[in-house]
């Protein structure tokens, strides 16, 4: 989700030291927290709705398909919207749309129709997409260019804080409530949590509508002074988009299957509620890794760090597939630590030197987040065909590409 982002950005050379971007960055961390929280809550929603509607693995992965499919449909229009109305207004629009999506869970629970839940998730994800398109590049240009990747890694650490808290929140308010409910009332377990989230997004929208964050422009010269054309002309951006696709696909796929995997008798045999609490270790590892990475990657080469983490993730997945019991459990949970720097590192490397094409490039990268819709669906089909254990071979392919991008593909 890097040493510095290597850009030639004169925007900051004369003004960065004179401006205080601290308050704006602090406000943006709230958005990253909520984005991570709402996304990771799907990991709890999947086993819950799987039980409510008696779904197989492939059908339950439609939750991620609809959520991350929104990135594919909304990202490019969102990039144009943000470029037209400013980063701040884009953030406000994203928050409002996300609030509406959360509110739609109330009628979905009342009618107890799986398709309505999927529709609500799509609307919610559309709002989150707009937030991602506006917030990610905004962070990279709020401050010195040589520390852009470090700032993005730090804000992503708060995204990870949200993903760490979400499983516990979901375990208590969704899975535990569903355990005590009748079959007909199980779907209602999501109403109160998502009502709270709708209110939270609404409050944040009001706050950002009132705030006056610094207005910065994307006036850096692009690599080779390519003022014409589009962001698609940059090879490292295109390969980076593939990197985002496979990274998000792998991360979402692993996270989506954790509750069911840890509930498997051959692994840990945990109850779904206990398994959900353990999911916090996976996302907590990513949080810790991002805080460490925010400081360490000021001194470490971006690409080499990315490749190293990808290789370790591959080793951990092989251990997960080849073993059972607590070794398999802790191996898969440890992957979160090495996922930590991947998204911000790929993102910052891919946006290097895009200049006036930065908004479009950000939209393309967010478009690639559709990997979170496709890869889990494939792993779901594998889980139905060969079992949930062997299905963890799928993310290995994704991490292999990430290693390639870190060593070779990111060179511009």
From Swiss-Prot:
Belongs to the major facilitator superfamily. FHS transporter (TC 2.A.1.7) family. GO terms for biological process: D-glucose transmembrane transport. Keywords: Cell inner membrane, Cell membrane, Membrane, Sugar transport, Transmembrane, Transmembrane helix, Transport. It is a multi-pass membrane protein. The lineage of its organism: Bacteria, Pseudomonadati, Pseudomonadota, Alphaproteobacteria, Hyphomicrobiales. Its main location: membrane. It is found in: Cell inner membrane. The gene is gluP. Gene3D superfamilies: MFS general substrate transporter like domains. This is Glucose/galactose transporter. One of its GO terms (molecular function) is galactose transmembrane transporter activity. GO terms for cellular component: plasma membrane.
């Amino acid at each position: 989700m890097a040493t510095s982002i290597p850009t030639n950005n004169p925007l900051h050379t004369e003004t960065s030291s004179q401006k205080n971007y601290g308050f704006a960055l602090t406000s943006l961390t709230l958005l990253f927290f909520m984005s991570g929280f709402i996304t990771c809550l799907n990991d709890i929603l999947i086993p819950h709705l799987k039980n409510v509607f008696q779904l197989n693995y492939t059908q339950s992965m439609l939750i991620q398909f609809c959520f991350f499919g929104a990135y594919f449909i909304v990202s490019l229009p969102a990039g144009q919207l943000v470029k037209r109305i400013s980063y701040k207004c884009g953030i406000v629009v994203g928050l409002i749309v996300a609030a509406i999506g959360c509110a739609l869970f109330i009628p979905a629970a009342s009618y107890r129709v799986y398709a309505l839940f999927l529709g609500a998730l799509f609307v919610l994800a559309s709002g989150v997409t707009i937030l991602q398109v506006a917030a990610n590049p905004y962070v990279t240009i709020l401050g010195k260019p040589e520390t852009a990747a470090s700032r993005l890694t730090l804000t992503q650490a708060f995204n990870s804080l949200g993903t760490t808290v979400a499983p516990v929140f979901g375990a208590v308010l969704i899975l535990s409530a569903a355990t005590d409910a009748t079959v007909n009332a199980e779907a209602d377990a999501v109403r109160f949590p998502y009502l709270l989230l709708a209110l939270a997004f609404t409050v944040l929208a009001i706050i950002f509508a009132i705030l006056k964050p610094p207005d910065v422009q994307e006036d850096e010269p692009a690599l080779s002074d390519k003022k014409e054309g589009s962001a698609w002309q940059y090879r490292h951006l295109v390969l980076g988009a593939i990197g985002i696709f496979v990274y998000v696909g792998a991360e979402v796929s692993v996270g989506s299957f954790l509750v069911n995997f840890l509930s498997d008798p051959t692994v840990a045999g945990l109850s779904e509620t206990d398994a959900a609490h353990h999911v916090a270790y996976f996302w907590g590892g990513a949080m810790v890794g991002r805080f460490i990475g925010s400081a360490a990657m000021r001194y470490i080469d971006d690409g080499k760090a990315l490749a190293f983490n990808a290789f370790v993730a591959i080793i951990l997945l092989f251990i997960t597939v080849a073993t059972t019991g607590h070794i398999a459990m802790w191996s898969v949970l440890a992957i979160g630590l090495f996922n930590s720097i991947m998204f911000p590192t790929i993102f910052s490397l891919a946006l290097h030197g895009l200049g006036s094409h930065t908004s479009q490039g950000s939209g393309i990268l967010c478009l690639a987040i559709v990997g979170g819709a496709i890869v889990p669906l494939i792993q779901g089909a594998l889980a139905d065909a060969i079992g949930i254990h062997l299905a963890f071979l799928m993310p290995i392919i994704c991490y292999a590409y990430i290693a390639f991008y870190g060593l070779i593909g990111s060179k511009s």
